Amino acid sequence: MSKIKIFALGGLNENGKNMYVVNVDEEIFVFDSGLKYDNDINLGIDYIIPTIDYLIENRKKIKGIFLTHGHDGNIGGIADVLEQLPEVPVYGTKLTLKIAKKDFDSELIQKTKLVEIKPHVKIDFGKNAIFPISVTHSIPEAVCYVLYTPDGAIVYTGDFVFDSTMMGAYKTDIGKLAYVGKQGVLCLLCESFYADKQGHTSPNNRVRGFIRDVIAKTDNRIIATIFPAHYYRIQEIFDEVSRTHRKIVIMGKPLQEMINSAIDDGYLVLDRDRIGTLADIESKNAIVLISDEKEKPFANLERILKGFDKYIEIKENDTIFITEPSYAGIEKRTAVIMDEIAMLGADAISLSSKKHLLHHASREDLMLMINLMNPKYYFPVKGEYRNQYTNGEIAEELGIPKENIILKLNGDVLELVDGENTNSTEHIETDEILIDGKSQSDIGNLVLKDREMLGENGIVIISCTLDKDTKEILGGPEILTRGFIYVKESQDLLEETKKISKEVIEENIEANSKRVDYTKIKNDVREVLGKFFYQQTESKPMIITVVQEI
């Protein structure tokens, strides 16, 4: 018998940033390592991942990180995590690992252990075992995971729909799911993204007919945007390209490499004669395909709309086709993009989130999964809290006792001892790491506050040069301001700023000339000038002090 703890470091009461931890006695299994996008378009945050302090502290217990599929919400943070936990093996299907590796630098590739899994092949860890099962999603080779423990199976669904038309690498193995359910499921962690949607997601996840109508009604160039790694949508577009004998022009080296590799591996099907070059980009017959790597959605399209792309310029008779319905987390970005398209006089077409759905489980899909699994405990994950709650209501309607439906927030622990819920109030500390551009660092709320300060109150930079040996001031202090005051009208204020800065610097040097504490100088200048500026202007600019020795 075992003590099992289940909790999320990310993914609860939010869309994206999925990372779920199952601790079985002294063994830890981590499921997914995702990111989410920031919905605030003004603060320069490209994506967000969860903190992993718990995993770092317990790194020797981790048996592996198990990735369900190759979308950012599930694998987008794996490179950042492995920078801190390079010894932890990562498990995934061939395609999932291939996509994940795109974010690895050469050093990380060398020191990371990636283990390719096959659906329906058990991975043994002694008294525990992992069993992956194929599920249907918008990308090939998506899986759910069954973690076999001495007290029963714990199932994490990942993202899924039930769609009997899907074949090959998109097909759900419903027989294997039913078999697991008959053996007995202790706890089912099931996605909640579309728990509020009635019926099955299929066929509303398939938009080939809509794409066909757009192409049929458009005589001019079409610029189509796709989300990264949405293979199913790309194939729908390719099918219509082939049918209408248009040329597809793929923008950007990363997207070109991804598509070429997918065609080589059989994940996408397209006659290469249909792939155009930059010479075809101005053609009325062209369909230009645009996507983004791991940064804010629509970044490449936005660059084109602003005239910053050297290969393509938006024209009034162009049609911009956003091929994915919007969802919580990117609504602001979508609205901004639609406005920018309208300002340029081009036509904008987007999918309605009411009529068209992503490949996530709706109410009937969830009901089928619950009936197949028949779990003792039901743990809604992956989605806003209201959707988790609705997901729980669906389970209750199907006969799962309300006390066995687990509604949690990130860090809240479900503890099962000998298969029974202890109603633990334990909470694992978790927070967010905000990633800015290509830097893999914790920006934190302080930097966001700085950015707000810059926008509202401007910046003042004080620079000063000291003699390396005597510590005498050789130059400055010089004052540079941006967005704070009108320099020509504020000479007295600037002179007083220089005087105050010089006094603070000299006082610090006199206090300890042998070992000057430059950090203290910067802090003291910021504190004194901050009070002075507020007294004089009622503003609080960002203050930066630069002291150099020569």
Where are these regions (language model features)?
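His/Asp/Glu-rich metal-coordinating catalytic cores
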Residues: 1-66, 71-279, 299-310, 332-334
